[in-house]
Amino acid sequence: MAAEEADVDIEGDVVAAAGAQPGSGENTASVLQKDHYLDSSWRTENGLIPWTLDNTISEENRAVIEKMLLEEEYYLSKKSQPEKVWLDQKEDDKKYMKSLQKTAKIMVHSPTKPASYSVKWTIEEKELFEQGLAKFGRRWTKISKLIGSRTVLQVKSYARQYFKNKVKCGLDKETPNQKTGHNLQVKNEDKGTKAWTPSCLRGRADPNLNAVKIEKLSDDEEVDITDEVDELSSQTPQKNSSSDLLLDFPNSKMHETNQGEFITSDSQEALFSKSSRGCLQNEKQDETLSSSEITLWTEKQSNGDKKSIELNDQKFNELIKNCNKHDGRGIIVDARQLPSPEPCEIQKNLNDNEMLFHSCQMVEESHEEEELKPPEQEIEIDRNIIQEEEKQAIPEFFEGRQAKTPERYLKIRNYILDQWEICKPKYLNKTSVRPGLKNCGDVNCIGRIHTYLELIGAINFGCEQAVYNRPQTVDKVRIRDRKDAVEAYQLAQRLQSMRTRRRRVRDPWGNWCDAKDLEGQTFEHLSAEELAKRREEEKGRPVKSLKVPRPTKSSFDPFQLIPCNFFSEEKQEPFQVKVASEALLIMDLHAHVSMAEVIGLLGGRYSEVDKVVEVCAAEPCNSLSTGLQCEMDPVSQTQASETLAVRGFSVIGWYHSHPAFDPNPSLRDIDTQAKYQSYFSRGGAKFIGMIVSPYNRNNPLPYSQITCLVISEEISPDGSYRLPYKFEVQQMLEEPQWGLVFEKTRWIIEKYRLSHSSVPMDKIFRRDSDLTCLQKLLECMRKTLSKVTNCFMAEEFLTEIENLFLSNYKSNQENGVTEENCTKELLM
């Protein structure tokens, strides 16, 4: 008996018992079993390998050599990986290993989401969970606080299995006899061995890690390997709906095959939770397999105590078939993977013929959508009353929170209803109601209330954009009693499901993807030999040269200018654009002083009723500019936005200059404008772009050219960009704020007069003209002011602007600052 006893560490490795004698056949040489180590040609008759007789090899080198040979044998011969061989191990090391084996606890978890708690759920925790479920519903945070010893993720994971088991069993209560009838009890009368073997077992083990990976477990399921036999045995017949899977192997030997099946022997006792008993619910209650109906097959080899259990009973096979039909997330075993007297041959066949893509078979939770019938008529809601259905659907406002009160819920709900009355029958999106609900809660909270009102038909009734299908969680238990309660419960679940992120699965190549992306695909499963043969055939084939024209450097030019399209009767302007004289003056001033592109923000307002965008102010910004492109400095952009907000304006657009070429957007400008439009449209706002060209060589007039544009959804014929459309701009008949324009002019002059791209304002701006750059600027400003004020005030203001420029640029010339390069650019 002493020679047969062996200790199993948490990796499944076999260590000779401390009581074994050196001459009893349990020496180190006997551990090298013939079927689990190298081919016979690699060793001598007595089983020893020649290199093991060399005493000069250190223990470290010996271990490295063993590992290399094991890996070579595993990958080349496709045999099962053997147990780790412990050579010349000291007795104190063995005792230390034995102590670790008896106290070790492992948690089996999904490799993508490691759980942080390995203790099984106690009866008290389960009772507290049920109390919290009855009191708080599916509020996992509150239930976690009630339990105290479990995190929110652990409570959620336990609840998933709890509801799943209730759905499988069909009844909330089940007698202990019914529960124990789902387990198969295997007894060895000679040694008193008992093993409760669940009919749904399939495991995978990694020999290099102290964790046993179980396929088809949920993310937070746990497996404990412990020696607490009495405690587990006492709790087995009691209520046990936990998702924890507990394995107990005290002082036993465990062989594990390459595919992950466990072959146990000696005195071992394995207890499993009832998470796997759901696949036996179709069996009769009194159908219990006795120990006489199951034969225990034991094989003893001369050099070791290797035992296997063969389950040959016909009823057991039928139960296995029933389990294979089960589609839950339990642990599933195939009948073809049961242990047999020749485990290595079975492993080889499985290696050659089977490729498991559990993730492709929808191991992850399915995200099916449950259709909700669209409301038949629009619902009128009393603005002063909160119905019970609203409290069930949006419970966060009725839990006594300081920030989320029923009064705040009324404010949000009634504001959304008011906005719907204004924009009816146009679709009311979530972002359009956010500006009027500042300091009323986060975006998701407002979105959930909007979704609830849309689902019940209070808003967006009859709109095509209204969506009545929401992703639904899998583990939801349906309430069948009251129809109204069912509808409210389902609605609440849809709203809660919006908080959870979409689960992903792995494709056959190991890449993360959406589960729906794998639907309708067929994968070809090839063995290693077939795959290698196909690769050799592909190498032998001549490579066909694809005659694809090489793209030239100019095939895609981000600075290519795209002419704007014009709105017509077929495609009308989405809104009108009106620009104040103050904004035109500042844009002209800013664009004239630099031969590099300048940039800034436009502030104003948008009237939804009149469909008019009013550009009231222009705020210059610092630019991160090169000779070819211009981007807005983030810090300066933030400051400009705050300046416009102080004046009561919203950011409704941006402007930049094309100093000496046409005011048409480049491909880069189109991309930038499209991104701005997409961002601001989420809140229901409008966003325009303006381009100022002061020194365009193709423009015979001294006035600047200005283009106001938006980017449409239409795609160009070659599919490389979206089409820009140009607005007809109207000037607003309001006098500018003279002092503000003068201060902006002073800031612009101080910033650009010493820059390398500064324009010499006293030089001729073009060869065929007598006007200097400053005189040209004054002509542009005079034209703008002629429509909003009398000529005397305009001339007085222009004189002050001219004196400001002359004083600054005269001092520059005295300091020796020349602008020859910019002059050449202007004259060209």
From Swiss-Prot:
Keyword list, A-Z: Activator, Chromatin regulator, Cytoplasm, Disease variant, DNA-binding, Hydrolase, Immunity, Isopeptide bond, Metal-binding, Metalloprotease, Nucleus, Phosphoprotein, Protease, Transcription, Transcription regulation, Ubl conjugation, Ubl conjugation pathway, Zinc
Domain of life the protein comes from: Eukaryota
Domain SWIRM: 372-470
PROSITE patterns: MPN (PS50249), SANT (PS51293), SWIRM (PS50934)
GO biological process: chromatin remodeling; immune system process; pigmentation; positive regulation of transcription by RNA polymerase II; proteolysis; regulation of cell migration; regulation of hair follicle development; regulation of hemopoiesis
Protein residues bound to Zn(2+): H656, H658, D669
Residues modified as Phosphothreonine: T236
Occurrences of domain SANT (ranges): 116-167
Enzyme class: hydrolase
Protein location: Nucleus; Cytoplasm
Coiled-coil stretches: none
UniProt record similarity statement: Belongs to the peptidase M67A family. MYSM1 subfamily.
Function summary: Metalloprotease with deubiquitinase activity that plays important regulator roles in hematopoietic stem cell function, blood cell production and immune response. Participates in the normal programming of B-cell responses to antigen after the maturation process. Within the cytoplasm, plays critical roles in the repression of innate immunity and autoimmunity. Removes 'Lys-63'-linked polyubiquitins from TRAF3 and TRAF6 complexes. Attenuates NOD2-mediated inflammation and tissue injury by promoting 'Lys-63'-linked deubiquitination of RIPK2 component.
Written domain comment of the UniProt record: Contains an N-terminal SANT domain that mediates histone/DNA binding, a central SWIRM domain to mediate interaction with chromatin associated proteins, and a C-terminal MPN domain that contains the metalloprotease activity.
Pathological association: Bone marrow failure syndrome 4: A form of bone marrow failure syndrome, a heterogeneous group of life-threatening disorders characterized by hematopoietic defects in association with a range of variable extra-hematopoietic manifestations. BMFS4 is characterized by early-onset anemia, leukopenia, decreased B cells, and developmental aberrations including facial dysmorphism, mild skeletal anomalies, and neurodevelopmental delay. BMFS4 inheritance is autosomal recessive.
Full protein name: Deubiquitinase MYSM1
Protein species of origin: Homo sapiens (Human)
Designated gene of the protein: MYSM1
